Amino acid sequence: MAANSTRRPIIAFMSDLGTTDDSVAQCKGLMYSICPDVTVVDVCHSMTPWDVEEGARYIVDLPRFFPEGTVFATTTYPATGTTTRSVAVRIKQAAKGGARGQWAGSGAGFERAEGSYIYIAPNNGLLTTVLEEHGYLEAYEVTSPKVIPEQPEPTFYSREMVAIPSAHLAAGFPLSEVGRPLEDHEIVRFNRPAVEQDGEALVGVVSAIDHPFGNVWTNIHRTDLEKAGIGYGARLRLTLDGVLPFEAPLTPTFADAGEIGNIAIYLNSRGYLSIARNAASLAYPYHLKEGMSARVEAR
């Protein structure tokens, strides 16, 4: 529940629906019809269709940047029309993140109260990272005819089972009345690659390519580096795909790498070890992809 009851409700909307037709507009039109005072923020509608893990990456950090009371409507629904239902959860807390571990807006009175945010998504693993990073207080299967159509369009569950109920929640419909409570084991999750220690090295994977820049992100977090005694200024060897070693100091900015094209090893804005070329692409000329191994060690 929002700390300020006079604040306009907010829905942050992420999907794989694209922007080449009226699908997103239909969803947003229904949101405004159900909750006329709502502000709908478009997070992203161009994620790779049906890629649950990519979608999970786009939504996990959002609470750091949104006011208390925001409803996050997040969807990629490959099983549309089946028995897969949506799940609505109240997260426990907005976890700290970023390269330095700070809150967005820290120092400006932006502390978040526990239980301030609701996510609604298909129960297909999309909330995996959210639940692991933030924890949750309550979770429900979204089945009530008060918040979803009695005969939902089977090919458009993103609209029927996510967008519409998110608007009811933003309008104040009680979370506990959207459907039956879910046990933890009933919430679908995917397996996240673990970061492991191999001698003095940390071993993870390439978690994302930062398009369109061609920067390479790994799943090795700032906290993993801290435990290994690695901080800014340490000279690192980062080996990708087992055969591509790059060496550079860990620096806060791309410009610290010096000339254009030089290698920069840095922490991205989400707090994960990353590698780039200053003002140039690294991923594209080296054909780097998600899922490749990433091994880092101090030199």
From Swiss-Prot:
UniProt note on regulation of activity: Competitively inhibited by S-adenosyl-L-homocysteine (AdoHcy) and S-adenosyl-L-homocysteine (SAH). Sinefungin is only weakly inhibitory.
Effect ascribed to mutating D16N: Loss of 5'-FDA synthase activity
Record EC number: 2.5.1.63
Reactions catalysed, as given in the entry: fluoride + S-adenosyl-L-methionine = 5'-deoxy-5'-fluoroadenosine + L-methionine
Thermal response of activity: Optimum temperature is 55 degrees Celsius.
Top-rank lineage group of the source organism: Bacteria
Keywords of this entry: S-adenosyl-L-methionine, Transferase
InterPro entries the UniProt entry points to: Fluorinase, SAM_HAT_C, SAM_HAT_N, SAM_OH_AdoTrfase, SAM_OH_AdoTrfase_C_sf, SAM_OH_AdoTrfase_N_sf
Effect of T80S: The 5'-FDA synthase activity and the affinity binding for S-adenosyl-L-methionine and fuoride are similar to the wild-type
PANTHER family the record matches: CHLORINASE MJ1651 (PTHR35092:SF1)
Assembly: Homohexamer; dimers of trimer.
Function: Involved in the biosynthesis of fluorometabolites. Catalyzes the formation of a C-F bond by combining S-adenosyl-L-methionine (SAM) and fluoride to generate 5'-fluoro-5'-deoxyadenosine (5'-FDA) and L-methionine. It can also use 2'-deoxyadenosine in place of adenosine as substrate.
Protein name: Fluorinase
Organism listed in the record: Streptantibioticus cattleyicolor (Streptomyces cattleya)
